[in-house]
């Protein structure tokens, strides 16, 4: 009988056994001198007593192969394997991308190749008694073979039948439409009624959609103090980084939604992870690459992003950084984009192109300036629309419709955000690429227009929050008061 070297690996053991059988078949072919009677006796002996493979060590001592388990084999390879450290693509200490949870698993026995006489002569009664227990355990261990979609449907249906949550009445639901639970003391018109025939405007449940957005935006905000918690990162570095991101966004002709999502993803990542200075550009590139795939119809290739970095990073590094960034953020890109809130407010502004263009410029100030980190997007949109209407000289600057379709923001709620925007306009130009972008003709030269107005407004000494400029009604109460304001502005 040929000797087989002892091994604990299942695959190697089975390969060795196949070699032994192959050698036996070759030896039987070569021994042509054996008679037919002897050949029949040998085959009968093989059928009556199955062949036993003995395991012989190098010392010549025969050992019987014991029962092996998959768990023992895997544990042996885990203990013998050398630990490999995966370096974070965006800097920091060596660590895996995500900690894997160790789940203790019961070892699965492999059928032994040695069939002892005692095992072959087991009684039929004991096997019948164990069949019931085996079937019961198999039904618990083996997962259902139903399709996943059918399983999810059945589980959700059973859950709904058990809960039977009572639905609120119409009067109760109307109170949850607004983010702020306060008494509505302003006049407003139902402008969504005009869109009942337009299915794309979803006027039936537009209030529920924005009510969900108002709750979601607070959860997706970054840490407003993360710039001061990191020892290497400074506000000036973020300003340069976002200005470069605006340049790349304009070069690729992407949607505004992609830029807002990229900055939000970048800020949220740096709120929980420390990024080295030489990896900031890689982080911004990966953030815009991820945002474009989420917002755009046709996203640029990763090679274009790597080329825009002047060869600092390869496409493989951009993809690796994207994977790590999404892993840290739990793949949560459900960010309520500020452009949705701006379009909602524009309905109360009669979709005026000028105020909307100026509002987009003022809204992008909130992503390039670090002072706006942590402010709600809906608040920034309402403040941008207020300041845009004030620049264009629209009266009233803020009325009941604008309060309602902005989410319930009054001037007192927007005071801090409006002051920060105004301070940015009167300050020297800090973000060159951002200023050049909105100095173009297609953007109505919004950056130049707003800065010139801010300097004149500051020189006049007027109040940004003049009570005569706003009302809780749809129009100003007194027409004579409106004429006085217009005459005063003309004299100045």
UniProtKB/Swiss-Prot annotation:
Region of interest called Disordered, as start-end residue ranges on this chain: 1-176
Similarity field: Belongs to the cyclin family. Cyclin AB subfamily.
Alphabetic keyword roster: Cell cycle, Cell division, Cyclin, Mitosis
SUPFAM superfamilies attached to this UniProt entry: Cyclin-like (SSF47954)
Gene from which this protein is expressed: CYB1
Low complexity biased stretches: 34-58, 111-135
Organism: Candida albicans (Yeast)
Compositionally biased tracts (Polar residues): 23-33, 59-83
Protein function: Essential for the control of the cell cycle at the G2/M (mitosis) transition. Interacts with the CDC2 protein kinase to form MPF. G2/M cyclins accumulate steadily during G2 and are abruptly destroyed at mitosis.
Record-level GO BP terms: cell division; filamentous growth; meiotic nuclear division; mitotic cell cycle phase transition; negative regulation of ascospore formation; positive regulation of G2/M transition of mitotic cell cycle; positive regulation of mitotic sister chromatid biorientation
GO molecular function terms attached to this record: cyclin-dependent protein serine/threonine kinase activator activity
UniProt-listed Pfam families: Cyclin_C (PF02984), Cyclin_N (PF00134)
SMART domains named among the record's database cross-references: CYCLIN (SM00385), Cyclin_C (SM01332)
Protein name: G2/mitotic-specific cyclin CYB1
Cellular component terms (Gene Ontology): chromatin; cytoplasm; meiotic spindle; mitotic spindle midzone; new mitotic spindle pole body; nuclear periphery; nucleolar peripheral inclusion body; nucleolus
């Amino acid at each position: 009988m040929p000797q087989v070297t002892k091994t604990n690996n299942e695959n190697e053991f089975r390969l060795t056994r196949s070699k032994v059988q192959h050698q036996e078949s070759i030896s039987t072919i070569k021994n042509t001198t054996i008679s037919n009677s002897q050949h029949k006796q040998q085959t009968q002996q093989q059928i009556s007593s199955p062949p036993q493979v003995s395991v012989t060590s190098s010392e010549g001592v025969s050992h019987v192969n014991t029962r092996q388990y998959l768990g023992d084999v895997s544990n042996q390879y885990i203990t013998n394997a050398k630990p490999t450290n995966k370096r974070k693509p965006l800097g920091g200490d060596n660590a895996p991308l995500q900690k894997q949870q160790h789940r203790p698993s019961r070892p699965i026995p492999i059928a032994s190749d040695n069939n002892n006489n005692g095992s072959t002569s087991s009684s039929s009664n004991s096997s019948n008694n164990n069949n019931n227990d085996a079937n019961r355990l198999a039904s618990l261990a083996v997962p259902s073979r139903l399709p996943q979609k059918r399983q999810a449907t059945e589980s959700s249906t059973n859950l709904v039948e058990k809960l039977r949550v009572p639905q609120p009445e119409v009067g109760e639901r109307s109170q949850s439409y607004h983010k702020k639970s306060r008494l509505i003391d302003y006049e407003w018109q139902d402008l969504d009624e005009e869109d009942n025939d337009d299915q794309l405007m979803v006027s039936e449940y537009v209030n529920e959609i924005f009510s969900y957005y108002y709750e979601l935006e607070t959860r997706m905000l970054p840490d407003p103090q993360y710039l001061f918690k990191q020892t290497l990162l400074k506000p000036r570095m973020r300003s340069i980084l976002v200005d470069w991101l605006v340049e790349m966004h304009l070069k690729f002709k992407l949607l505004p939604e992609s830029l807002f999502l990229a900055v939000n993803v970048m800020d949220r990542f740096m709120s929980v992870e420390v990024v080295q200075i030489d990896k900031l550009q890689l982080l911004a590139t990966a953030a815009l690459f991820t945002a474009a795939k989420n917002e755009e119809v046709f996203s640029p290739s990763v090679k274009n992003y790597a080329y825009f970095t002047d060869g600092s990073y390869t496409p493989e590094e951009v993809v690796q950084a994207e994977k790590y960034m999404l892993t840290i953020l739990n793949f949560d890109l459900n960010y309520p984009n500020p452009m949705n809130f701006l379009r909602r407010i524009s309905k109360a502004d009669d979709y005026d192109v000028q105020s909307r263009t100026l509002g987009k410029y003022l809204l992008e100030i909130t992503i390039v300036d670090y002072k706006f980190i942590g402010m709600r997007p809906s608040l920034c949109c309402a403040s941008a629309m207020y300041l845009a209407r004030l620049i264009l000289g629209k009266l009233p600057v803020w009325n009941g419709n604008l309060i309602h379709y902005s989410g319930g923001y009054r001037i007192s709620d927007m005071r801090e955000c409006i002051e920060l925007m105004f301070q940015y306009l009167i300050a020297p130009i800090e973000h060159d690429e951002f200023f050049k972008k909105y100095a173009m003709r297609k953007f109505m030269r919004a950056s130049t227009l707003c800065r010139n107005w801010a300097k004149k407004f500051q020189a006049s000494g007027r109040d940004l929050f003049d009570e005569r400029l706003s009302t809780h009604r749809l129009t100003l109460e007194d027409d004579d008061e409106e004429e006085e304001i217009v005459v005063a502005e003309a004299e100045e």
